[in-house]
Structures are given as structure tokens and as C-alpha cells.
């Protein structure tokens, strides 16, 4: 069958006005962060940051005026990084002569271009939180968490940093038995909850905005965070892969486990076939198919798929006019690393 995989009929299919998220900014009072500093962060990352990003920085400044980025280090084991490093001025203290590449700064092994790390936790599991946005010209749709040493799964944790920290704190409170530690955590929880209430941020794990996005998700992908691509009223924009997720994982496993190059080439045949289907799909403006296959291969994690992912993903992102994501994935695949992801270290 030409095109491979049927078209998906989704309830949310229809012309998509993806700019609605911008409304959020006017809802809250602006955080007291200078426009120069805001411009510096957003110019370095080439991404707009939501107001909760700046509000949370001010909240941490109140907890620890000297080192806001470490305000939650002792109590929660969390540190503010990534774009927060720019607010802290860390990039100006950089010793390395090479320039800071924000596309790779705190980009963990499984982080897709849609994910922007803002907080790190336990180094053993590489726990981290980040903003997840469907397109580089939009504000984030939620805060996700991932443990890169375990897998590629991204878990949704509210639509702002306050909610993500609150959920982390609640989990921590269930684990801690020491009275003194419980008291410290409860104190932070009270301050956090009050700050979020004053500013009007929801502390829910799944908000109405997030549920609305769910209706636009065309496929979950291996990372589970879902992909959103424009699908018009004629259902043009996405078509399903001819293989289920389980089958695709089996195909990937066969490639990785192959005993010889010859076997590996044979095991690669179904992927080659799917790439042909993607070409048909791209010709018919179903750009989501190539994005899904490329993302799944990236998420599987093996270097055997880097070349194919490097062909599929930049093309898909460019066709979707998400050019920054194309650049991020190119940079990431060129130096994909499990360690040394702090661009400001040393």
C-alpha cells in the first residue's frame, strides 16, 4: 500500500490555532526581572520563556538571596540550571574559550528538541525537569520530568514550575521520616503554595490547558509526551506508521542485537521500507509521520539509529517550520552524550 499506514482520524483534527498559549502572559503580573536580562535569556536560547519561569526565580531569591539557583539544593536536592544559569550570570564566568551552545546546555541523552531543561535533581538517575513545547515559536505546554539513566519517558508535571516543584515536594514528604526534614519541607510547601496562589498558578498535575492539548496529540511516541502537528479538516498532516510501537521496538532490538553487519543490514530492512513510506507521506504533506519515526528511533537511543534519525528529524522539523528544533537535533546527534552536558562546567 502506497504511503504505508492509514490516515488517523482524530477528534481534535481541524485547523489548529496554535497561538492561543500566548494569552497566558497577560493573566499574571510580571515578575521583577529586567527586560535586558529577559532578552539575554531568550536571545541565547532563541525561545520565549513563560512568566512562571521568572516568578519562580524571584521565589528562590526570597528563599536564598545569595544563591537562588541553589535555594532548593539542601532541602529537595534540586538545582536551577539551563536558562536559570543566564539569570544567575554563570555564562559570564565561563572559563572555556568556546561559545556557549544553548541547544546543548543541560540537554540530557533522551531530551527531544521540544524539551528544555530548567532544573536538575539526583545525579544517579539524571532526574531533571524541563519545559515541553510543541513548536519553538510557542510557550511551553507543560513541565515534564525524565530520568535519563533509566529511560526516555517524559512524565507531565503541571503547566508551570510551581506545580512541578509542588508535586516533587509532595512525593518527597511521603518518603521522609526525619522530623526536622519534614518541618523544612512543610515550610517550603507553605511558601510555595502561597506564592502560587497569589500569582494565580494552578498546582494541578494535569490542567485544562494540558487536557486540551491531549486532543491535538496525534501519537504518543516512545517518550510518551506526544506529538502535536497541524492536521487540517481533510485530515492532512499526519498518517500512522505501518508498525505498532511494540513492533517497532522489536525491529529496533533486532538491529541492535544483530551478530554481524550482514544480519544488521537485514534487520534494518523494515526501517528502510518505512523511510520510503515517509517520503510518500512528505510528498502529500503528512509531515507528522517522519517526525514520529525519527523521534522513536532517537528515543530508542542506540547509535545505530543516529544516522537515520539525523535524516528524518531535521527534515520533518523544517517541513513543519520548526527550524530551531531541526538545529537542536542536528547539534544533539553530532555530540550526543550521557555525561558532560553542562556547557558551563570547567
Swiss-Prot record:
Entry-annotated residues carrying ADP-ribosyltyrosine: 238
Subcellular location field: Chromosome; Nucleus
GO biological process terms held by the UniProt record: DNA damage response; DNA repair-dependent chromatin remodeling; double-strand break repair
Residues carrying N6-acetyllysine: 19, 186, 233
InterPro entries recorded: HPF1 (IPR019361)
Modification type PolyADP-ribosyl aspartic acid: residues: 235
Function (record text): Cofactor for serine ADP-ribosylation that confers serine specificity on PARP1 and PARP2 and plays a key role in DNA damage response. Initiates the repair of double-strand DNA breaks: recruited to DNA damage sites by PARP1 and PARP2 and switches the amino acid specificity of PARP1 and PARP2 from aspartate or glutamate to serine residues, licensing serine ADP-ribosylation of target proteins. Serine ADP-ribosylation of target proteins, such as histones, promotes decompaction of chromatin and the recruitment of repair factors leading to the reparation of DNA strand breaks.
Family that this chain belongs to: Belongs to the HPF1 family.
Designated name of the protein: Histone PARylation factor 1
Biological source species: Mus musculus
Lineage: Eukaryota, Metazoa, Chordata, Craniata, Vertebrata
